[in-house]
A protein has these predicted regions:
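Glycine- and hydrophobic-rich flexible loops that cap the catalytic core of alpha/beta enzyme folds
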Residues: 1-197
């Protein structure tokens, strides 16, 4: 076991050729709108005050893999990780500048430009939740919002739409380059990095 300090965005989500899997024994994605709003406020505050914000622990372990990407199982921190992933998708979809959009999408997908790694569409995503959530996440990433669960169990859809609203409100405050300001605030999120080998 190794314990260090890690940055949620740059150490886990950004690197290419990594995929984080949420095991079946973990509960389905369940973050409430209040938790999402609090996380968004913390991210904005971290950017404005230019300081790090501790957001808990991230416990993970390597998985055997047949493809040339490193795969990990998330043992603790899956709710926060999934929420950040949804927020990045909302940021990318809110970006009006194509270079900002492309940069944000690098956080969502493993690049395989020349099909060297043999990644299928599901392996290209850097997050693989439990089956029920995975189906909804696949629809979100494909931009098929009309096919997503919008009922009370449609938490991924509802939190994505909430983040779109929060981002729109933030943009309306006339911030220059504000999409990337939110990304920079996300980079200030640190956690206790606990890797089990």
């Amino acid at each position: 076991m190794r314990i260090e300090s890690g940055r949620m965005l740059n150490d886990y989500i950004q690197p290419n050729k990594k995929q984080y899997c949420i095991p079946v024994f973990q509960r389905d994605y369940a973050w409430t709108s209040e938790q999402c709003e609090k996380l968004f406020e913390d991210i904005v505050l971290a950017f404005k005050k230019d300081r790090e914000h501790f957001c808990g622990s991230f416990v993970y372990a390597p998985l055997p893999t047949r493809k040339q990407i490193d795969r990990y199982i998330i043992i603790d921190g899956q709710q926060r990780f999934t929420t950040l992933y949804i927020l990045i998708k909302a940021l990318a979809d809110s970006a009006t500048d194509e270079s900002d959009k492309a940069e944000l999408e690098k956080y969502l997908y493993n690049e395989d430009k020349f099909n060297r790694y043999g990644l299928d569409d599901k392996s290209k995503l850097k997050l693989k939740p439990v089956k029920t959530d995975n189906d909804q996440l696949q629809l979100l990433m494909a931009g098929k919002l009309d096919k997503m669960n919008k009922g009370k169990d449609g938490i991924i859809y509802h939190n994505y739409m909430l983040f779109r609203e929060l981002i729109a409100t933030f943009l309306a405050e006339d911030h220059d380059d504000s999409i990337m300001m939110i990304r920079d605030g996300m980079d200030s999120l640190i956690c206790a990095d606990i890797r089990l080998d």
